């Protein structure tokens, strides 16, 4: 077991790649470390895979082991379970730049498993996992057109930061991950604090330039490993079948792709496909229906792309820069705290906003440390939105990814907890889909939040851009349809305000996307975004002045920190009874800030008065109306404030000499008492006699 090791300096970090010791039965395996964050990636590919498929079965699994952070998992079973949301998102992050680098005809099964085995809380493992995956695929011998590099880019005070630490990211205006080969950007994922198009494009170019050290180092590493390449070749193209299909279907496809209605268009294409298959199979028994279907799909792609490059109208009749018809409605659901129905062409999102207390915040316990999330955005894509039947259950990877993208788009305009002390949950139900449903969710979320009375810094809109490129000719498309996304060369989603970008996601399927093309796409996206924002502002010019009558209103008071235990009580008994009796939710922070959430002013006032009574200080010389709670031979104990009793000595009951306390006082009797003294131990001396004298004098 002789390891092959390659180390290189990457910005402020040292990266080490190692293979040859672990997982030697896998096709390839690499341990990648970056300043104590270590990710182990295994790749297994089936070389002699003869199974007939019409897709590439690439699976990427990313898992974080708690032992990496020196922790034992919580829960009953004390072991890692289903992937967390962050693990799912990082798996998608690895998959997206890797998938387009396998050749079109490659259908062999490939599985990538990335395992975080050691974590430095300051070094994010996602970039490390992507570098390790690139290295493992590059030494696997599979027909992988890599390697890829990866970089995280921050932006602070006009300077770009390469692979900023967790602490540096907290004050950065940008969190962008970019991945690509030596000559092409393939994937961008980012959230930003309302930055200009030029700054965002500069970040992409900066990250791609800086990651070239990774690409070159992996090439050197792969050359040292020197694993033989697979003996794989793409299936030969049946030119006679291509010609026959073009004769039978091309003109009909050109007609079908002028039908603007999605359902009618799909019906027409389905009919053409079925008829051509039937005719060709009848004329040549050696042909297979599956092969004919693949060739028909390729012809569809050619037809759509050729029309766009020639400057002909798009599938639905629009020109490249046009946006589909918009319909914006707010307050569509009577009992939700905020709601909106956003429709763009045949894409529609019903979005709701719900306000809760800080107790409703999501606690995320990851190997990077525990954190609270006070803003949740969930995206649901039911099968009916595309006119299909299907399983309805827990969210799939795509739904988790689209939800996080929409959240990134809105996050920059959300108020701070100090400005708006609520936990906010937004849910986007996609009710119709024909392209760009995640960006419809951004628009709907902005509207629903404003409808709920959340004081956003600005309205946010999102738009999906596409690209068709043939040789040196290219056309950038605004507001792409599902078919244009599927048949095009780029999916480019931008969310932002009138002032700048809040989120950018880019997936590129081809090489040769220049800075010029990205600049044109960003500028075209800005024009589209401003158009959508204008329509949104006409429907709801500004947020509601007040929150919904059905939302909890949060009232804040301050108490002495020494009194916190009095409000909470033994085992939480006092605060629990307060919540139950007043119908409120009460939260107490360590600095004595008390937040009372109630749906009515009466409930809030009741809770506030009770808390004030519980925390009130006993003042010497003040007269209180109290209740006798216990009699003793030497006097009576009187409750003057919640949880605070004082002693009326037998000599302080009245002017006459008292022989027996019970002759003058009964348990439960209300009496007026004057506070004579509070000693160092907090014991209170009371007097009924002096209270009576003072009352008489007044």
From Swiss-Prot:
E.C. number: 2.7.7.8
Record key words, sorted: Cytoplasm, Magnesium, Metal-binding, Nucleotidyltransferase, RNA-binding, Transferase
CDD domains the record matches: KH-I_PNPase, RNase_PH_PNPase_1, RNase_PH_PNPase_2, S1_PNPase
GO biological process assignments: mRNA catabolic process; RNA processing
Cofactor: Mg(2+)
TM region positions: none
Binding sites annotated in the UniProt record for Mg(2+): 485, 491
GO CC term (a single one): cytosol
Domain S1 motif residues, every copy: 621-689
Domain KH: 552-611
Top-level taxon of the source organism: Bacteria
HAMAP family, A to Z: PNPase
Alphabetical list of PANTHER family matching this protein: POLYRIBONUCLEOTIDE NUCLEOTIDYLTRANSFERASE, POLYRIBONUCLEOTIDE NUCLEOTIDYLTRANSFERASE 1, MITOCHONDRIAL
Function: Involved in mRNA degradation. Catalyzes the phosphorolysis of single-stranded polyribonucleotides processively in the 3'- to 5'-direction.
UniProt subunit comment: Component of the RNA degradosome, which is a multiprotein complex involved in RNA processing and mRNA degradation.
Protein name stated in the entry: Polyribonucleotide nucleotidyltransferase
Organism of provenance: Psychromonas ingrahamii (strain DSM 17664 / CCUG 51855 / 37)
Lineage: Bacteria, Pseudomonadati, Pseudomonadota, Gammaproteobacteria, Alteromonadales
Encoding gene, per UniProt annotation: pnp
